[in-house]
Amino acid sequence: MELKQSLSTHLEAEKPLRRYGAVEETAWKTEGLGRNQLDIISMAETTMMPEEIELEMAKIQRLREVLVRRESELRFMMDDIQLCKDIMDLKQELQNLVAIPEKEKTKLQKQREDELIQKIHKLVQKRDFLVDDAEVERLREQEEDKEMADFLRIKLKPLDKVTKSPASSRAEKKAEPPPSKPTVAKTGLALIKDCCGATQCNIM
C-alpha cells in the first residue's frame, strides 16, 4: 500500500506543467486561493485588464481593416491605369485611321475604324463601372469608420475611469483624447479621378 502511494506521488510530481497559448508554462498555485478559485487557469501576464485586452484587440482589427482597404485601393489603381493605357493605344490607332481621307480608305480600314470605336466605348464603360465601385466602397468604409469610432469611444470611457489614479485625475483637467485611427493618405476614388478625370475619361 505504501509503495503504491509512493509511486502515485512520484508520477504526480513528474507531470508536465500545463500550457496555455504562447505562455511556456502555467504553474498551479493553490496557496492562498479559495475553493472556487482552484480551477481557474490564467495566463502569466495578469497586468492587463479585460477591458484593455478587448480595446487592443479592436485596434488590431482596425489596423487589419486599413491594410485590406489599402490593398483594395491599389488594385483599383492598377486596373484604372491599365484601362487608361488601353484606351490611349486604341485612340492613337483610331486617329491614324481618321487622318486618312474617306475616299482613300479601304474596306478593311473602315471595318477596323468601327471596331476601334466599339472597343473604346466598351473600355470607357468598364472604367465608369470601376469608378462607381470605388464610390460604393468609399461609402461602406465611411460607415465602418463611424461604427468603429463609436465602439472605441464607448470602450475608452469606462477604461479611463478605472485606470486613472486619484493623483493623475487631480493633475489632469482635460481627459486625454482617444488615439487617432490609422488613415490612408488618399482614397482609391480620388486617385482614380486624378488619372483621367471624374467618371468620364478625359482622353475621350
From Swiss-Prot:
Q: Which GO terms describe its cellular component?
A: microtubule cytoskeleton
List, in alphabetical order, the GO biological process terms annotated in this UniProt record.
negative regulation of microtubule depolymerization
| UniProt-listed InterPro entries | bMERB_dom, C16orf45-like
Q: Which domain of life is it from?
A: Eukaryota
Domain (bMERB) spans 3-150
Designated name of the protein: bMERB domain-containing protein 1
Its source organism is Pongo abelii
Annotated spans, Disordered: 162-187
Q: What Pfam families does the record point to?
A: bMERB_dom
